[in-house]
Amino acid sequence: MPSPKLVNGQVVYNNEQIRPIYSGNINDVKVLPANQIYGEGLFFAFDIDKIKEWSETYGLENYYKTTLENGSMGEFLASEMGIYGRAKYYLLHTFSHLIMKELEFSCGYPTASLSERLYYSDEMCGVLIYTADGAEGSMGGLVWQGQPELIEKIIISALQRASDCSADPLCWDNSDGLNKAACFSCAMVSETSCEQGNMGLDRRALVDPEFGYFKDLI
C-alpha cells in the first residue's frame, strides 16, 4: 500500500482499493453518514507541545521508527504514525488501554463494554473512553469516575500496575511480536474495544525509568 500524503491538512491515499464514501469534490459534501451513540465517557486531552518536547528530548521518533521497520506493524498504521508522530501515538494509545484495564480492575467495568476513540493528528492529541447506552456500566458510573480525586487515583494505579507484567521480562523486552512491550496481561484489551486491533502499544512510553512520559509519577 502506498504511503498516505498530507494535502491541505487531510490524509490522502493513492490506492485503487481505498475509495471515499462519496463522489465528486470533497468541498461540495455537506452531509456524511454517521451513527449517533448515546452513552457516557471520559475524555483525556494531552499537551501537544509537551509531548513534542518529550519525544525530541529522548529521540523517540527514531527509536519507534526502528521498531516499525521490523515489519511487525501494519503499513497503513505505520504510515499514519510517520506523519503525525510515532511517540505520540504510542503514548496516547497505550494510555487509553491502561485506563480501560484499570477501570476493569478498580471499578468493575469489563473492557468489552468500553471503547476508545483516539483524537490523533498534527493538531489533536486526546482519547475518549466511552460506553454505549445499554452496555454494562452505562448508568452514570463512568462519569462518576471522572471526579478529580477519583480519576487521579485511577491514573496513578494504572501506571503502577503497568510497571510490571506477569509475562516480564519477555513482555518488556519483546521486539519481535505484534506489539513492543505489551501483551494481554498488561495492555491489550478486547479487539471490539480497540480502534487499531491492539497494534501500537508500548508500556515503556509511559513508565520506562529512563524515558517514560509519566516516570516521575510512579
Question: What is each model feature region?
Answer:
Residues 1-218:
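Extended, well-ordered protein cores
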